[in-house]
Regions:
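Non-heme di-metal
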Residues: 2-165
Length: 165
């Protein structure tokens, strides 16, 4: 399921928010994978990358909590996790961490993917005239905050990459 032109029901919104949760889990898992792949001496030498990866993991956990709170307020049945995971893998999981030339490129891809997802979801909600069982203003505010955090992540990774070029 991709973010369409508009969101037409609580069920569809819940499903899209669940996709966001899985995306955040992917970002966290990939950040953890990269951190674990750093040699011990690299962990000590590159505090900036270590900090970036730690921040990405912490931010993803916070984002998942915010999305879970929104889902809890919806009048919709939960979609099985396995189904959502399959949808995310098909739509957003085309690459693996080792497909990138380094940690920073992969992290940039993760941040950009999450930003694009939230941006598309916000537009789809704004294009919808459906009344959801959660407050629309609150919903959009939370999603805009998540999008802004992802934009900041893109900028942070880009700055680090430019400084190292």
């Amino acid at each position: 399921m991709s973010v369409g032109h508009s969101v037409t029901s609580d069920h569809q919104l819940a499903r899209l928010l669940q996709i966001g949760i899985v995306l955040e889990e992917v970002v966290e898992a990939r950040a953890h994978h990269h951190y674990q792949s750093l040699a011990e001496e690299d962990r000590d030498l590159d505090d900036e990358i270590e900090s970036l990866l730690e921040h990405a993991a912490e931010e993803s956990a916070e984002h998942r909590n915010a999305l879970e709170e929104l889902i809890a307020g919806l009048e919709a049945d939960s979609v099985p996790f396995e189904e959502i995971e399959t949808l995310v893998e098909a739509q957003y999981g085309q690459t693996k961490p080792e497909d990138f030339d380094g940690i920073l490129y992969d992290q940039l891809c993760n941040e950009e993917t999450a930003y694009k997802f939230y941006d598309d979801l916000i537009k789809a909600i704004e294009d919808s005239d459906v009344e959801f069982s959660v407050d629309r203003a609150t919903l959009l505010s939370v999603l805009r905050d998540l999008r802004a955090a992802e934009r900041d992540g893109v900028e942070r990774v880009t700055t680090i990459m430019e400084e190292r070029a």
